[in-house]
Amino acid sequence: MAALWRGEGDQDQGDRPYQEDRWALRTLPDGTLLAVLADGMGGHAGGAVASKLAVDAFLKSIEQGQSLAEGLQSANAAVRAGAAAKAELTGMGSTLVGALVKDDEVRWISVGDSPFYLVANGKLERLNADHSFVPQIDAMLERGMITAEEAANHPSRHALREAVMGEPLTLIDEGKRKLAAGTTLLVCSDGVESLEHEKIAAGAKQPVRHLLDMVLAVGKPHQDNVTIIKLDRQA
């Protein structure tokens, strides 16, 4: 019997004056569930425009039967064209996570730092690579090259090594994974990281709105936009 997947998504603006996240969830003709999320950057107009362009182009590409890699390149081209059309949008960009789930397998592609989590048996695992400078900074901490305080306050900690900005992409994460019954997948913007991983795992079986409220309840100053798409394997 084919696995049955259920998906839902929602978002919150947090403490920001505007929403730069964009997400979409679609069921393709063959029953595959498609989820895509983009977290824009480049100011109020730029970030929101970039994330919309990226998601819309990615969706169109996948719905036309193209691969995840082709969808990503379409998203990148759309952001490039959008930035070229208006001078005030120069430098805009976004992260992107796209995932396809069908039967017992997930395939994904991502650029940037938006996390893609797997939750199984109460444990949270990040599936995709983090293209911010956090992994390098944490590695420096582990090697004793910097202190914990220096790592936490490093000026590049939240900077991205790669993003969908219309330039050639040098860092792209792609993968696939077999999934057991009862597995939950979470496609998120990095605003979710205000919440500890253990609490994300504990709230993964709740409705997305409940998980968003858990993030907001942390009360982090200047809470970023937060978006969560939840994919549950039912059988």
Label every PLM stretch briefly.
Residues 1-235:
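PP2C/PPM-type serine/threonine phosphatase catalytic domain
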